[in-house]
């Protein structure tokens, strides 16, 4: 019998949910944060059709379902669906009883206060957890990279944020958040593929475009140069087979979609690119800490997985920074899951054990305790 019950670490992303046990080096379960509902009436008796499907099952039956993501831009917008996802995580993916394990959840920085309270309430009241903690995603990514100082560029499916951290303290006045991330790039790719004559419109077809994006897109080091290369030869063209067997060819769309990270104006957004956002965030910090931030720019999240993104980032930041400044981009290979890995490290530290909000504290103070205990 183990004397210590492992905590559960759940990183609820806008696109994928990563879940597992504290102390593990990778999440046990990674599945899409999707809830699907049938678009048609079930007519076969005894098929055991459900009124909703979660995760991979929703993904595989997507042809007959309407897919909804309960988390948009890192903020939970549909709590009933969110509860379904958590239920699925505990009972189907991890196969644990949530009332027996402390639970660590993650959230985006600058999240609405109500959001954390509601999360706390559901964990304690619906799932009866013995203890709970909520941690900021970017901070966990820094833990995972083994640093206490650095500036984290965390870009997932729903939200991108830049969080400077010095000696373990996040500098809240310099945190920037951009509501542009993987999902917007998928939508943009859908749009530019339509210009080529390939239309994708349903929620299921959007998932196909996401797959094209993940398999074929990359970031150009020099965008103008790349556009020229693409127009002169077909060396950059790649083909992709759709589920029905039709083969499509994509060329400059491969790097035009992720270019939106550096030029959000193509999406009609006013914010600066990720390089400008990172630079501005560093400039909001004290002059004494900037050198350490320039030298520790840590990438995390699935949207930083494009080939070529580190080199481009290095080039762009170097151009903005003072000429003598040493700029270093750290892009760990496991950065897709670095938030989860950081959570796993945090929840297994002996010094962390007094940080949990216990069920008893919750019963005494209610959901608002989360603002006092988790920061």
UniProtKB/Swiss-Prot annotation:
Annotated InterPro entries: Actin, Actin/actin-like_CS, Actin_CS, ATPase_NBD
Subcellular compartments: Cytoplasm, Cytoskeleton
Enzyme's top EC category: hydrolase
Catalytic activity: ATP + H2O = ADP + phosphate + H(+)
EC assignment: 3.6.4.-
Sorted UniProt keywords: ATP-binding, Cytoplasm, Cytoskeleton, Hydrolase, Nucleotide-binding
GO terms, molecular function: ATP binding; hydrolase activity
Entry's Gene Ontology cellular component terms: cytoplasm; cytoskeleton
Major place of residence: cytoplasm
Signal sequence annotation: none
Pfam (any one): Actin
Family in the record: Belongs to the actin family.
Function as written in the Swiss-Prot or TrEMBL entry: Actins are highly conserved proteins that are involved in various types of cell motility and are ubiquitously expressed in all eukaryotic cells.
PANTHER family hit by this protein: ACTIN
Protein name in UniProt: Actin, gamma
